[in-house]
Amino acid sequence: MSSGSDATSHPSSSIPPDDPRRNLILTRSDDPNLPHIGLVGDTYTTLLTGKDTAGRFCLIDMHIPPGGGPPPHRHDFEESFIVVEGEIEATFRGVKSVAAAGETLHVPANAPHQFHNKSDRQARLLCICSPAGQEEFFAKVGVPVATRTTAPPKLDEKAEAEFRAKAQALAPQYKTELLRQA
């Protein structure tokens, strides 16, 4: 008789068998090999990609400076935010809520939303998108930065207009719609 637990699946289980091609992934947020992306003032570090999770979700470490955050948008996937540091003001279908460190927000697919750091301190969020793909959009429209806390370069008016045009053009490929400010 074995003293360990039986790690094989039961023959009548409805759960698929283990896929030995997939491995445990340990990600360290300060790993210099992770992609650090600057997006109009915010810095996003992809901790887990769709490739890591068989497309099920991605995990992004977001550093949002005072005044930062994305414009109104919506997308055809679920998105959750865990506030790790600071606080953000989230607008969901036109209603504003404040989420502070230790709190979680969940945005259902297709719902218009945005978030904004109205405080005078840095905010840090962990963002989960399911299924994955948003991390690819960020990589296409953003600019690489050195670390997860490196601020992206400041954009002049022309560069910001070019960024917005590029984001608007690529958004549909990533099941995202950028909305007008109310």
Where is each model-derived feature located?
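Short histidine-centered beta-strand/loop micro-motifs
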Residues: L48-T49, G69-H75, H116-K118
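A short, N-terminal "cap"/entry segment at the start of jelly-roll beta-barrel domains
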Residues: S2-R56, K154-A182
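A contiguous, mid-protein "functional segment" used to position or interact
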Residues: R121-A169
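Tight coil/turn sites that cap or link beta-strands
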Residues: P65-G67, A101-G102, N110, D120
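Short, conserved beta-strand element in jelly-roll/cupin
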Residues: L59-P66, R74-F92, I128-P131
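Short acidic-glycine-tyrosine-enriched beta hairpin
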Residues: E87, G94-P112
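Ligand-binding loop in jelly-roll beta-barrel domains
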Residues: T53, E89, A109-E135
